[in-house]
From Swiss-Prot:
Residues 1-30 are annotated as: Disordered. It comes from the Eukaryota. GO terms for cellular component: plasma membrane. This is Solute carrier family 40 member 1. GO terms for biological process: cobalt ion transport. One of its GO terms (molecular function) is iron ion transmembrane transporter activity. The chain crosses the membrane at residues 70-92, 109-129, 137-157, 191-211, 218-238, 314-334, 347-367, 380-400, 409-429, 446-466, 472-492. InterPro entries: Ferroportin-1, MFS_trans_sf. It is found in: Membrane. Residues 1-18 have a biased composition (Basic and acidic residues). PANTHER family: SOLUTE CARRIER FAMILY 40 MEMBER (PTHR11660), SOLUTE CARRIER FAMILY 40 MEMBER 1 (PTHR11660:SF68). It is a multi-pass membrane protein.
Length: 524
């Protein structure tokens, strides 16, 4: 009986091995077929990212137009968007992981494009009735709230699509192929996103400058409505045409069902702490209610994650990077709205944003060269202070009398600083990859993203407090001070690791001056 069982097991293993070999041999589909589905993926992702990047740029212009002398509406929208991402971002990731691909596709594209269409429609109504705020303030407020909520839902839906395509499908489609295939797909997908970030503001700015603001809102709403169907057809074609995605979908459905069964069958834990047994009605003699709550909070996974983060060697670089999110010195909602208020043409703002994105893209080429010569730690130092030096131009623009020149100085300083900013970002990320243990890497990454989103939210809250565009100089000084604090923290970290900051002896001119000033030992 045992021999028969062993023979049956061996036979099953041989069948599985043969099936695996059969699957591995013809894994690569015909080049034309695979190329077609990869192109479908790229085109669908481009359409989705174009909608997201267009709304990201346009919403600031709409808000400053609706409330011309205040950054209040733009700051409120930015705060709602950042807050929703910070709070619901992890939930979106769990939701994407727990559903099958078809449901994720349908919900992602439905909510993203529907919410953007609703937001665009609300903006159109607000722009068509220019005096709605004075004529009917409740309706004006309802449309503003609708725009904010729809925009936040659109951003969360976009996050779901980004996780699905960038973190899942690209990996699944490249399974069984050389690593260069995944590298190429990642590069193309990142290039699509950066191209959308580069070009959509330019196109939108041209429409606003040479047609009208209303035309841009109508174009955006129509684009979101039409492309929803095209995106769904492209992505569902990829899902149906790539067997690896179908097999991955079956595995994730099985994992989801297994987790549900394990959750139902999990044993009920019984507390062994005196005074907490079921049916016990008395109060513990030595522990008050507040102490019990504090004890539970200290043992929660949330507090545990932060404890792990602050115990890392790279906590100072992580905090330094997060502090850079507490700024208005970027082509974000607040600065874009301020430039619009200053009278800078919209297409110029779009071009400036495009130049900024191009400079940031160059950082991915310069960083490997510097890192190979200076090490990751020192590359972070040099890149950070190069960014800080460029931001001095933004600070100097505060004392320039002519508003247009000051605005162009602000844009130039921000655009130039992107090279150092993104190089510093890459340096900190690489330090976390190298120095954080594998068991803590996801926890540290999650806390880092949470900290960055929280500081980004604080920047928008600051914009709500200082909402007059005339007072943007206050936000500029606060942002520059925060950046300076981040630089000091990173410099302290480097000094703590290396016991020095610069190699003065490696600077020939400085070395000669020092030796000329100091007396020789023979003369002493």
């Amino acid at each position: 009986m045992e021999n028969e069982t062993e023979l049956r097991v061996v036979h099953q293993e041989e069948q599985q091995r043969e099936e695996g070999e059969d699957e591995s041999q013809p894994q690569n589909p015909p080049p034309a077929l695979r190329r077609r589905f990869v192109i479908y993926l790229y085109v669908g992702y481009f359409l989705a990212r174009w909608s997201a990047r267009t709304w990201e740029f346009s919403v600031a212009l709409y808000m400053i137009h609706l409330w011309p002398n205040s950054l209040l509406l733009a700051a409120i929208y930015g705060a709602i968007e950042s807050g929703s991402t910070a709070i619901f971002g992890p939930i979106v990731g769990q939701w994407v992981e727990g559903m099958d691909y078809v449901k994720v596709l349908r919900l992602w594209l439905l909510f993203q494009n529907l919410s953007y269409t609703i937001a665009g429609g609300a903006v159109i109504k607000l722009l068509l009735v220019s005096d709605l705020k004075s004529r009917n303030l409740p309706v004006f407020a309802i449309l503003i709230v609708l725009t904010n909520l729809a925009g936040a839902i659109g951003v969360l839906s976009t996050l779901a699509g980004t996780i699905l395509i960038e973190r899942d499908w690209a990996v699944v489609m490249s399974e069984g192929h050389p690593p260069a295939v995944l590298t190429k797909m990642n590069s193309v997908i990142r290039g699509i996103d950066l191209s959308s970030k580069l070009l959509s503001p330019v196109i939108t700015g041209l429409i606003i400058s040479f047609v009208s603001l209303k035309a841009s809102a109508i174009t955006f709403a129509a684009w979101a409505t039409i492309t929803a169907w095209v995106e769904y057809w492209l992505f569902i074609s990829v899902y149906s045409g790539v067997p690896a995605i179908t097999r991955s979908n079956e595995r994730r459905i099985l994992r989801s069902r297994t987790k549900q069964v394990e959750g139902r069958d999990a044993p009920v834990s019984v507390s062994i702490v005196p005074g907490t047994e079921e049916g016990y009605t008395g109060n513990p003699p030595s522990r008050t209610g507040i102490l019990v709550i504090l004890d539970r909070m200290s043992k929660s996974s949330f507090v545990g994650a932060w404890r792990i983060y602050f115990n890392q060697e790279v906590v100072l670089p992580g905090v330094s990077l997060a502090l850079l999110f507490f700024t208005v010195l970027s082509f974000g909602t607040l600065m874009t709205a301020t430039l619009q208020w200053e009278g800078i043409p919209t297409y110029i703002i779009g071009i400036g944003r495009g130049i900024s994105a191009t400079v940031g893209l160059a950082a991915t080429l310069v960083y490997p060269l510097m890192q190979s010569r200076l090490s990751t730690l020192r590359t972070g130092l040099w890149s950070f202070w190069s960014q800080w030096s460029c931001l001095l131009v933004c600070v100097g623009s505060i004392w320039v009398k002519k508003d247009k020149i000051a605005s162009y100085m602000l844009m130039a300083g921000v655009a130039a600083s992107r090279l150092g900013l993104w190089m510093f970002d890459l340096a900190v990320i690489q330090q976390m990859q190298d120095l954080v243990s594998e068991s803590d890497r996801c926890v540290v990454g999650g806390v880092q993203n949470s900290l960055q989103s929280a500081l980004d939210l604080m920047a928008y809250l600051l914009g709500i407090i200082v909402s007059n565009p005339k007072d943007f100089w206050i936000l500029t000084l606060i942002s520059f001070s925060t950046v300076s604090l981040a630089g000091m923290l990173y410099t302290i970290h480097l000094y703590r690791i290396r016991n020095h900051i610069f190699h003065l002896e490696k600077i020939p001119l400085l070395n000669k001056c020092i030796f000329k000033l100091l007396p020789s030992r023979g003369n002493v």
